[in-house]
Amino acid sequence: MDLSMLRAKLHRLRVTEADLYYEGSITIDEELLDAAGLLPYEKVQVVNVNNGSRLETYTIPGEAGERTVCLNGPAARLAAPGDEVIVIAYAELTPSEAREHHPRVVHVDENNDVTKTRTLDVAKETDENLAPDGMEDVLIAEGPQS
């Protein structure tokens, strides 16, 4: 059985444009794609922090250095310029591959300039967050608890 694992994430990009009449996708500055290890035309999930919408599309490289983040086609209805979005790519991995996997997370500022890049260690996180009583598959989530 394969697991769907986080592969790369661009965290809190600021939408700069929305083009309803383009045929579809999300245009992202190619330097940002490179920073996260995302490829042109790779399938991604886009989560809008401002309104909670989620969509799947694919990436199109934008002009390097322009810091463009543009939702195209019908996706343009789900975000407006100024909205913050999280762009996520996943990989299908076997459990043994997943334990050796190192997802990349890129943080940006309000101008879509990279402020921090992290490479996560799945094996370390799994070992440190195992639930008691041998429940290896139950991880404790970080962040505020309700």
From Swiss-Prot:
A single BP term in Gene Ontology: pantothenate biosynthetic process
Listed pathway(s): Cofactor biosynthesis; (R)-pantothenate biosynthesis; beta-alanine from L-aspartate: step 1/1
On this chain, the residues bearing Pyruvic acid (Ser) are 25
The cellular component terms of Gene Ontology attached to this UniProt record, alphabetical and capped at eight, are: cytosol
Q: Which reaction does it catalyse?
A: L-aspartate + H(+) = beta-alanine + CO2
Task: Identify the Gene3D superfamilies for this entry.
Answer: 2.40.40.20
The organism's superkingdom is given as Bacteria
Cofactor binding note: Binds 1 pyruvoyl group covalently per subunit.
Extract the SUPFAM superfamilies matched here: ADC-like
Instruction: List UniProt keywords, sorted A-Z.
Output: Autocatalytic cleavage, Cytoplasm, Decarboxylase, Lyase, Pantothenate biosynthesis, Pyruvate, Schiff base, Zymogen
Q: Where is the active site?
A: 25, 58
Post-translational modification here is noted as: Is synthesized initially as an inactive proenzyme, which is activated by self-cleavage at a specific serine bond to produce a beta-subunit with a hydroxyl group at its C-terminus and an alpha-subunit with a pyruvoyl group at its N-terminus.
- The residues that hold substrate are 57, 73-75
Q: Does the keyword Nuclease apply?
A: no
Cofactors, names only? pyruvate
* Enzyme nomenclature, EC number: 4.1.1.11
What GO molecular functions are on record for this protein?
A: aspartate 1-decarboxylase activity
State its location(s). Answer: Cytoplasm
User: What's its top-level EC category?
Assistant: lyase
What family does this chain come from, according to its entry? Belongs to the PanD family.
Q: What does this protein do?
A: Catalyzes the pyruvoyl-dependent decarboxylation of aspartate to produce beta-alanine.
How does this polypeptide assemble, per the annotation? Heterooctamer of four alpha and four beta subunits.
Q: Could you identify this protein by its name? A: Aspartate 1-decarboxylase
Species per Swiss-Prot/TrEMBL record: Salinibacter ruber (strain DSM 13855 / M31)
